[in-house]
């Protein structure tokens, strides 16, 4: 790709050697193995597991917490430059793979993001919101992504009880403070796309009120998923609120489809304006679309049309479109592999063979 070449060869006992432009990488045998027609694919699957070890830590730290002192936690840290546990990062990673590859450490990482109320007497557990534009909650309100990960780990009874407690507290809090009954959607920033002018109008760099009062496709889909989980768990607990959660989810699904869809361009918009002007802005994002498809909240024909028309280049699919020439590269003008992975899942659900092939190729090239 782009004038660069790499090849992989199988070695002894399930190991591999990757010959890449920057040198050789020796990949040890891993607990999970794939056996496909591509040695490169199998090697990269092993490499992903080998690199996962670099994120396994016994303590985490962040300069914003306890003066940067280590906090004991057998967790997955976010990365070399982010040696902490962040709600959306660990949740998306867990939903995609970590919950299956290392359920215990994933569960411990998720538990680190649960908190009691700071006032010391309000009952319940709540999911911590990551920082974002304007600080944190409620400008950013995608903390419910935590439940996207937690749903895979409910076989642990103690953890399942925590999930149920956190669902009740977090959903009640968001219903009171973030949900807009007039519009029928939850307010707040796009999930993951949390750098103001990178994806929102340039003037939001100095004024985040618009972001906090707007409505994002991705974040509303995550709220929908959390409500469906609450409906299921409430039913299992014999809790009459199961009917409320179902009604809220059903109504939210209708509003997501009705308000974010633009028939003239055949796409679901990334976000729409505040209640006074709830119009879709001319911006689409691949994560929001993919999450909507996977949640089955978007009608199949519209979903197929939108995914098939989403822009793609030789390197893969950008996370947002259109891109802004005057803005630096980060979310803007960029491909993020985890978003490509969700696009791949969405394509598989819709049997979109060209998109499946393209996203696999993009992920392999990036790796």
Where are these regions (language model features)?
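Acidic/polar, glycine-enriched structural segments that form the non-catalytic walls/loops
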Residues: 1-83, 157-159, 164, 168-176, ...
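Extended glycan-interaction surfaces of carbohydrate-active proteins
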Residues: 3, 35-84, 108-136, 179-214, ...
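Aromatic-rich carbohydrate-recognition surfaces in CAZymes
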Residues: 83-190, 216-224, 334-356, 360-361
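Solenoid-repeat scaffolds in large eukaryotic assemblies
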Residues: 106, 242, 249, 303, ...
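Alpha-helical solenoid scaffolds that mediate protein-protein interactions
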Residues: 113, 153, 167-170, 174, ...
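Short coil/turn linking the two alpha-helices of tandem helical-hairpin repeats
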Residues: 154, 231, 235-238, 297, ...
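Short, glycine/acidic-rich hinge or "gate" loops at secondary-structure transitions
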Residues: 162, 185, 241, 245, ...
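Active-site neighborhood of glycoside hydrolase catalytic domains
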Residues: 217-259
